[in-house]
């Protein structure tokens, strides 16, 4: 089983940071939207993997990561991935960069409707925003 880790960054408006993946047939989920994340490397714990992926893809260094969920999903090649998802609040100080994909931006939850998203990501974004409202 492959392990993945990701971070849903929520801003003060309740928007979530999403990446528009490149439209290349050689990658998984081309031309889809997703939150920052990727594979967990050998000898790396899930939180460290999530932090690394977030920084690599956006340049953003999160202060606190809160665990959101661990669950399985199927990739386009039918491989099962165990994803370890965290969430954090955007500090409004650091610039968000697009170091991977074609675009990186905060989207309102309503804007996720009609977009091609990775499996289960809309539900997880809603869940992260609900958790953020409790802080």
Task: State where each predicted segment sits.
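Charged phosphate-binding loop/patch that engages nucleotide di/tri-phosphates or the phosphate backbone
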Residues: 121-135
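Surface-exposed, flexible loop/turn segments at secondary-structure boundaries
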Residues: 13-15, 24, 73, 112
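Conserved Nudix-box catalytic region and its N-terminal flanking loop in Nudix hydrolases
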Residues: 15-56
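Conserved hydrophobic "DFG−1" position in protein kinase catalytic cores
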Residues: 9-10, 18, 88, 106
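Conserved N-terminal beta-strand and adjoining loop/helix that marks the start
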Residues: 1-17, 36
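Short connector loops at helix/strand junctions that flank enzyme active sites
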Residues: 2, 30-35, 79-83
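Unchanged
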Residues: 39-63, 69-124
């Amino acid at each position: 089983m492959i392990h993945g880790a990701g971070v849903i960054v929520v801003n003060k408006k309740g928007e979530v940071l999403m990446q528009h993946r490149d439209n290349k047939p050689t990658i998984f989920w081309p031309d889809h939207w997703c939150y920052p994340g990727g594979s967990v490397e050998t000898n790396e714990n899930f939180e460290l993997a999530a932090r690394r992926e977030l920084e690599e893809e956006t340049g953003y260094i999160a202060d606190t990561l809160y665990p959101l969920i661990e669950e399985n999903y199927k990739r386009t090649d039918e491989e099962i991935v165990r994803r370890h998802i965290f969430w954090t609040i955007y500090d409004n100080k650091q610039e968000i960069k697009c170091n991977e994909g074609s675009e990186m931006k905060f989207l309102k939850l309503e804007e996720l409707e009609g977009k091609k998203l990775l499996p289960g990501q809309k539900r997880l974004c809603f869940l992260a925003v609900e958790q953020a409202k409790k802080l």
